[in-house]
């Protein structure tokens, strides 16, 4: 009876033999493709610049694909520029525009090279899977450019017109950003984050923002991450703990710029209570300089001590 129930459920998706056979053929063929690349990162600890570079460069895989695709056709300098364009397309396009190098020739060359790289990195996936990863606004154009044989005399003009029209209607820069995103997406099929995203590093919030835009990621939370979750729910001990950790490592940027936490009441309180105490044991460990909110280390030490004492009190209250 249970088998009959399962068969009835399957019949909704596969109403006849042809439908079932078609899917079996497709799944069996997929088993013959190489497995998608999986990346494991552990203990990020808020080091956003290193993490984002490794993620966007696929730990050097993209540079390797450029070398495999173009060999000695392009110079090493052009390889580096193409790689950086894929990693940080918006930033590189702005730099090229400022240098007055954003010409039609540059756009055509960039689009052509990016399409070749995209073909290379998409070769291990089915067309269906590649389509699912394509940015919606350019999915039709990218699909045509990837799978049209531009060496076919009947399609050469068509291929060229696709690229020319992108430039004529002034969406080449948006297209470049989109196909660069697709390339990065195809070089990493699954992303696994193990351990702490938060800790003593400067900007864990930027790491989270980057992960929110990633297509397939799973996270094993660490103890520092749990503390931030507790703080977000309003637990006073957790709030004090995350503030203490950030202040102890000079992490004012993540608090004030990243999450908009107003530290002025704490600084005024600490200045008043510890005005005659240098709090030298609580001086912050300056691993990274604050970009947006530079705070005098002496004041930071007083704030650090104040929040530490408040944390001990908050923890004691939770056990009463």
Regions found by a protein language model. Name each.
Residues 47-48, 199-202, 224-229:
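Active-site environment of divalent metal-dependent phosphoester hydrolases
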Residues 23-35, 180-190, 203-213:
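A short acidic-Thr-Gly-centered motif at the start of a beta-strand
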Residues 318-319:
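Conserved small/polar residues in nucleotide/adenosyl-binding loops
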Residues 17-124, 293-297, 305:
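N-terminal low-complexity, Ser/Thr- and acidic-residue-enriched intrinsically disordered segments
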Residues 96-180:
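Low-complexity, highly charged intrinsically disordered N-terminal segments
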Residues 54-60, 207-211, 232-243:
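Short secondary-structure boundary/capping segments
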Residues 70-97, 229-285:
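Extended charged low-complexity segments that act as oligomerization/scaffolding linkers
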Residues 43, 196, 223:
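Divalent metal-coordination and catalytic microenvironments
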